[in-house]
Structure formats: structure tokens, C-alpha cells
């Protein structure tokens, strides 16, 4: 019984991404949006046990990766995530394995969700200004860092900003980082103390 239940759980995890990718394909077909399903292989050496499926869509003649399964893994009731909406190859393959079957090259990032929504920032000063607004309005801060590589040094600098601005209002910063995609989510809650940092794994369901 235990082994059967384990196999069922593994099948559920494996089939979830394929089902979601096929659902996106059906929805895009209904909306007249060109869309295909992309599939990557497992990689046991990295602890990735199963194949993974997502979508490639076409917007204004350009191709983009779309992975609703990864975004669903990261999303919570208070913050829906769009980290994997309209990514270029150089972005998606930071945390995706190579595709098994060839798909169109995705070289453009103009329609990346956070860029279109003006939530892709390039300077610490801009992050500080937006952090002040989020703390003042008691809102979640969710953004993409585009000011060069998100290194440990850059993250430390940003954490100082979150902590300083949160402490002004007697709050504490809870930070979640999608490191491969350089997306940062910050929640501000009442209470003093050091900020808490969580490194997210959008592919945790397949490991």
C-alpha cells in the first residue's frame, strides 16, 4: 500500500505540469494565440526526477516561454506570481533542462511580465523608493531585479534597504527570492527584528 501510494504521488507530480501545459495550449487555441507544449527530460544528477512540460507562445511574431506550473508553485493566496510569463531562452534555461524536441528560439524579452508591468528595476534607489511605498501602504513588494546579475553582494544591499525601510514603520521584512529568475517578493509584518530570507525553488514538486 505504501509503495502504491508513493507511485500515485509521483504520477500526480509528473502529470501535473503536462496537464497544465495542455490546458494552456487549449486556452490559447481558443483565444487564437499560437502555442505549443515544450518538454524537457529528467536530470537525476541534479535531483530532477521527472520530465517537465511548459509552453512556448507567439506574440507579435516573437516567441516566448510560459511556465504556469512553476508560477503556481511560487504563488500564495496573497501574491500571485508571474516569474515565468514570456521568458527568453537565456532566462528559462537558468532553471529548466534542455528541451527534448526542438522549439522556436525565444530571443526577445520585451513582453516579460514584470517589464511590461514596470516592475523590473535597475537601481537600488528605485527599489528603496518602491519599498517605502509598499511599507507605507502595507502592501507586498514584488519585483524583478534587472540591474545586472543578482549576486550575493547585490542581495545583501537590497536586504539592508528592506530592513531599514521596514524598521521605520516598526515592521519586519520577510523576503522570498527566486534566484534563477532574479525575482524578489517582500512581505512586511508588524514586529521588530532581522529580516528573514527564503530561497525559493519553483521546481520543488519534481525533485
Q: Can you say where each PLM-predicted feature lies in the sequence?
A:
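Generic structural signal for beta-strand residues in well-ordered domains
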Residues: 2-4, 48, 134
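Poly-acidic low-complexity segments
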Residues: 6-7, 67, 178
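Short beta-strand element of the conserved SAM-dependent methyltransferase core
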Residues: 13, 55-57, 186-188
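N-terminal accessory/pre-domain segments preceding catalytic cores
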Residues: 88-207
